[in-house]
Amino acid sequence: MNKSVIGTKQMVVSPHYLASQAGNRILDKGGNAFDAAVAVSACLAVVYPHMTGLGGDSFWLTFHQETKAVKVYNGSGRSGKNVTRDVYKGKSAIPLRGIDSAITVPGMVDSWDAVLKEYGRLSLADVLEPARDYAQNGFPVSADQCRHTEKNIELLASTPYTADIFTRRGKAPVPGERFVQKELADSLNLIAEKGRSAFYEGDLAQRIVSHLQNNGSYMTIDDFKAHRGEWAAPVSSDYRGYSVYQAPPNSQGFTGLLTLNILENYDFTQIEHGSFEYYHVLVEALKKSFLDRDAVLTDPAFADIPLERLLDKRYAKQLAEEIGYLAIPAESRPVGSDTAYAAVIDADGNAVSFIQSLYFEFGSAVTAGDTGILLQNRGSFFSLDENHVNTLEPRKRTFHTLMPAMVCKGGKPKILYGTQGGEGQPQTQTAIITRMLDYGMHPQQAISEPRWVWGRTWGEEYEGLRVEGRFTDKTIQKLKDSGHLVEVVGDYDPLMGQAAAIKVDEEGFLQGGADPRGDGAAVGI
């Protein structure tokens, strides 16, 4: 559980072993990291369908060895042009599930096309082949999918089309059962044949929009036709002599950078890992970052986001000086956690750190008719308060929790890391990177060590600090004494999300780690 997988040439990590294996096969067939990443992404949409799918969004953080460029592809969708606050008149918030929550165009399929056109060697049809096979012929359903199905069984069983795919006469499938998605296979075959246009302009787009409109949605075919993701420069900061890269807004990536800037003011050689001091400082630094994030984060096309000020080291020092022994009360808005993070490094040194999501588990719970495509509920995170920075407006991207990360040194990737978890993403990322850079842990150890999550996640109203049962009694008591509302959960609790990481060591070998809390795998050669 604490031993990283070692590769001499290539490494793929993901939250599902079948997706990791598929990515490795694409590399073996002559594809590069970008081809393999798209293959993994598509496979996750099939074998991890409760967490991600064609109806969701994605963010891609890429390193191209030939040009040495670090770039981000923003594969998040915008709200429909007719979706205004007036649509929800009389409501205090956008519904978390159902048609009224499926109000943004899915961006992931577009991102596949963009990444392959920019850097890929293989065709879209080639890299989609493993996903098409898993959808057509089935795969053993994971325990994680069964658990989330059982948790949401009433919702899923009562939703047309969704019930037929994800339940067995109103009950959850059992782990290991063959799970076949023939309608999704047909949709993937259409995309393989006709490309992104099938999803945004052609038959699939028409069928998705028809289903939405027949059930009262304000989304239109023009919303799908208008969708374009874009390449962008990452946001970055230095930590302990390393360059840390994140996706720019509307991603919450800068939250992770601000937190590291705060923590750089602490000497971790004087703080024992796993001690009260370690966890307390990290939690309080994250709370500071969340306050700034929540005040400014939205679509940068609709607001000025003061990244230069927020990522100024002097500002981080001020925040660090405000952290004392007592826990500071803070609030966090409930967010979803249905996310899948994965990463790939190939033999040439190309690297992709990417993440995708439906937002909540099973997204909106709306399957677009006979397409087999489950639609995200990401738009439910918009506010209906006209004065809120993330207020709902037409053709706007919402505050996004997805945040793939990459650490470079000497102009080359050293660590790729990320996690599932919504509000937990910056928390787990901070744990992983401090463990690796400050305490010298390898990826698997950094991921497997006891974790925590503060605040609301998985859509729940919660203001406490949940810690895994492997925290020492002494640490738990000290956290309580300092004012943290501590709840002890399982030793390897799925609530903590599923993380993954790849490290390039000093010899150039690849170390991969996947989360023991789930079904993931690191596969290297």
From Swiss-Prot:
Description of post-translational modifications: Cleaved by autocatalysis into a large and a small subunit.
Protein biosynthesis among keywords: no
SUPFAM superfamilies: N-terminal nucleophile aminohydrolases (Ntn hydrolases)
E.C. code: 2.3.2.2, 3.4.19.13
Alphabetically ordered keywords of this record: Acyltransferase, Hydrolase, Protease, Transferase, Zymogen
Catalysed conversion reaction: an N-terminal (5-L-glutamyl)-[peptide] + an alpha-amino acid = 5-L-glutamyl amino acid + an N-terminal L-alpha-aminoacyl-[peptide]; glutathione + H2O = L-cysteinylglycine + L-glutamate; an S-substituted glutathione + H2O = an S-substituted L-cysteinylglycine + L-glutamate
Induction behaviour: Positively regulated by TnrA under nitrogen-limited conditions.
One of the GO BP terms on file: glutathione catabolic process
InterPro entries in UniProt: GGT-like_enzyme, GGT_lsub_C, GGT_peptidase, GGT_ssub, Ntn_hydrolases_N
GO molecular function: glutathione hydrolase activity; leukotriene C4 gamma-glutamyl transferase activity
Phenotype upon gene inactivation: Grows normally with glutathione as a sulfur source.
Nucleus among keywords: no
Active-site residues, record numbering mapped to chain: T339
Gene3D superfamilies for this protein: 1.10.246.130, 3.60.20.40
TM region positions: none
Pfam family membership, one: G_glu_transpept
Task performed by this protein: Overexpressed protein with an N-terminal His tag has been reported not to hydrolyze glutathione; it is not clear if the construct is processed to 2 subunits.
Protein family: Belongs to the gamma-glutamyltransferase family.
Complex formation: This enzyme consists of two polypeptide chains, which are synthesized from a single polypeptide.
Note in the entry: Is not involved in the utilization of extracellular glutathione as a sulfur source.
Name recorded for this polypeptide: Glutathione hydrolase-like YwrD proenzyme
Phylogenetic classification of the source organism: Bacteria, Bacillati, Bacillota, Bacilli, Bacillales
Gene name of this polypeptide: ywrD
